[in-house]
Amino acid sequence: MFLKAVVLSLALVAVTGARAEVNADQVATVMWDYFSQLGSNAKKAVEHLQKSELTQQLNTLFQDKLGEVNTYTEDLQKKLVPFATELHERLTKDSEKLKEEIRRELEELRARLLPHATEVSQKIGDNVRELQQRLGPFTGGLRTQVNTQVQQLQRQLKPYAERMESVLRQNIRNLEASVAPYADEFKAKIDQNVEELKGSLTPYAEELKAKIDQNVEELRRSLAPYAQDVQEKLNHQLEGLAFQMKKQAEELKAKISANADELRQKLVPVAENVHGHLKGNTEGLQKSLLELRSHLDQQVEEFRLKVEPYGETFNKALVQQVEDLRQKLGPLAGDVEGHLSFLEKDLRDKVNTFFSTLKEEASQGQSQALPAQEKAQAPLEG
């Protein structure tokens, strides 16, 4: 059941993306989570993927979700499952091979850096402190921005609740006609303010990626003198570090966005509940309005308490990743597994290439079809 759910969700993500813009990152995340959770059973899962029954279910899913399928999504449907099957098969085969390659790479790096172990550890420690200094303002900035946006959300929404209560107190006969516009505006304002909230908080992820690049580049320069004949191997490890750190930034962005959407989902039903009582008695409407104000304050406060600490948690995660690199390169590293981040990076690169190729082919197909269509629509000369 887990396998079927994951593969169906993979197809669904791709299909819903095809309606607007295909998000290769979403598809790659589904595939990587699938591979990670299956673990040692990945080979068996690949065999299941190839069964015709599952392919038929995917075909049914495309038909159910899309109805009339356009040329692009039909092409995607045909290519997605074989691509996923082949890629997971390669992941299974490459995992142990890559693990051994990374082990040897780290051994060579450690051997080369061993005479300078103290200096290398010091340089990485300096980099950690610089990273903490760079991220400090981000933590405070995110916390401030969350508070600002939450207060703005409450300021924008409360007046609508107050106006509806005022109309109710005035005992206006036609409550439905008087209150309904405010209830509609309240619901629209929820959508508008949640989108603004997401728009103000998610750009932090892009700023963080720039800081990550800067910090990793400084670390590379500081370690370069100690790794002159193994520079390529050091660069490879730093690429893995940057990938993992940027992944944290993307996860932060996704968590903020998901919490904002969750806030909207919790507020909208209360607004709809007011609508539902407009044709009922005054007492029911009054009760739903009281619930609306109290629910608004409660849910907004829960959102604030949940999102505020994200900056600090994110900072700690980034610092820990640099510390993990220090351990990998140190003389007492032990059996540190570092190959999975490289495997995931390779998967994401391949998924991006796959979708870029599909989009390019679709674009070329549309370009070729346009002149033929224009020719067919041209008036006949008499």
Swiss-Prot record:
Origin species: Sus scrofa
Keyword Lyase: no
Family: Belongs to the apolipoprotein A1/A4/E family.
Keyword field: Chylomicron, HDL, Lipid transport, Repeat, Secreted, Signal, Transport
Name of the featured protein: Apolipoprotein A-IV
Region listing for 13 X 22 AA approximate tandem repeats, in residue ranges: 33-330
Physiological role: May have a role in chylomicrons and VLDL secretion and catabolism. Required for efficient activation of lipoprotein lipase by ApoC-II; potent activator of LCAT. Apoa-IV is a major component of HDL and chylomicrons.
Subunit-structure text: Homodimer.
Entries under Pfam families matching the protein: Apolipoprotein (PF01442)
Record's signal peptide: 1-20
Comment field on protein domains: Nine of the thirteen 22-amino acid tandem repeats (each 22-mer is actually a tandem array of two, A and B, related 11-mers) occurring in this sequence are predicted to be highly alpha-helical, and many of these helices are amphipathic. They may therefore serve as lipid-binding domains with lecithin:cholesterol acyltransferase (LCAT) activating abilities.
